[in-house]
Structures are given as C-alpha cells and as structure tokens.
A protein has these predicted regions:
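Structural marker of alpha-solenoid helical repeat scaffolds
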Residues: 21, 55, 89-97, 131, ...
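Helix-start (N-cap) detector for alpha-helical repeat units in TPR-like alpha-solenoids
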Residues: 26-27, 60-61, 94-103, 136-137, ...
Length: 181
C-alpha cells in the first residue's frame, strides 16, 4: 500500500520488519531490492537480490532484477550474462509464460541498446514480438531505435502501436513529433 502511495520509505521499513521475522521471505527481499534500486542504493539492492537468489536460485524476478541492476550500474557484460543465461535455461525448460519470456528479450535489447548494438537489439525485439505482441514496451524501444536510425516511418508506426496498446498518447507527444521532422 505504501508503495502505491509513493511512500517508499515506509514500505522499505515494513519489508525490513518482515525480513527481521522471516529472513528468507522472497517477496520482501524482492520488493526491498526494488525500492533500493529506485533510491539508487545499488549496493543494498544487490545484497537483497543476491540473498533472494540464495533462497531461490531460479527466481525469475530476482534474476531479472539483478540484470537490471547491473545495467543501471553500467555493468553491461554482467547484465548480458544474467539475461543470456535466463534465456538459454528458459528455452530448455519453458517454465515461463510467453509474456515473461518476451520480457527477457526486451531486457536484453535494452542492454544492447545501451551498448549501441542497435541491430542486435532489433533482433531481440523481433523475437519479443513473436513471443508476445501485446507488450507496449517492445514497440516503444523499437520505435526509439528506428528514430535514432532516422527510420521515421517505422518509428511512427511503432509509437502508434504502443498507443494502441495503452500508452497515453501525451506521453509520446515529443517522440511522435520527431517522426514528422
């Protein structure tokens, strides 16, 4: 409830209390790590993600969170390592929904985009669309890449698709204007 109200400090205190009582509570570890990431307290976030992964090494959210943390810290190779491992092991076992699997490709595309490997990012985004075409994040990222590549018609199409999937058009006003210039 506190997080929904923007009171992360109170939510963090509650999760810490839960962890005092239950050291290995996966949800509390995950949510506190998330709060730490929002506060840019990356060392604390990493400690919680690593603790979570000791409790449950297969935790999708824990591993994805750790990869996101590595990316935010500019540790792109580490982030790619986590994501590549998740994609490889998921492909073998397919324990995830197609939506969760697609989000792994979106996450990896984000790291590739940060590394300026736009073609590799586009390949991952195509795979994400194949797995689950209902995720607006895919079209937003691909539209941004197309815009950077001066492929304005393709960018516009993707931004419009993101709007059709629920992204408020006002949020994309600047990006859509850039496709017209």
């Amino acid at each position: 409830v506190y997080m929904e109200l923007g009171r992360n400090n109170l939510a963090q205190a509650d999760y810490s209390l839960v962890l005092d009582l239950e050291k290995n509570n996966e949800e509390a570890l995950l949510m506190r790590a998330y709060i730490y990431m929002q506060q840019r307290e990356y060392k604390m976030a990493k400690a919680d993600y690593e603790r979570l992964l000791k409790v449950n090494p297969a935790s999708y959210n824990g591993r994805l969170g750790l990869a996101t943390l590595e990316q935010k810290e500019g540790k792109y190779e580490e982030a790619l390592g986590v994501l590549n491992n998740m994609i490889a092991t998921t492909g073998e076992t397919s324990q995830l929904s197609s939506s969760q699997y697609a989000m792994l490709y979106v996450a990896r595309a984000g790291v590739e985009k940060d590394l300026n490997h736009m073609d590799m990012a586009l390949v991952d985004l195509e795979e994400a669309i194949r797995l689950d075409s209902s995720q607006p994040e895919i079209y937003l990222m691909r539209g941004e890449i197309y815009l950077a590549q001066k492929k304005k018609d393709l960018a516009k199409r993707d931004f419009e698709k993101a709007v059709s999937l629920g992204v408020p058009q006002a949020d994309l006003r600047d990006l859509l204007q850039q496709t017209r210039k």
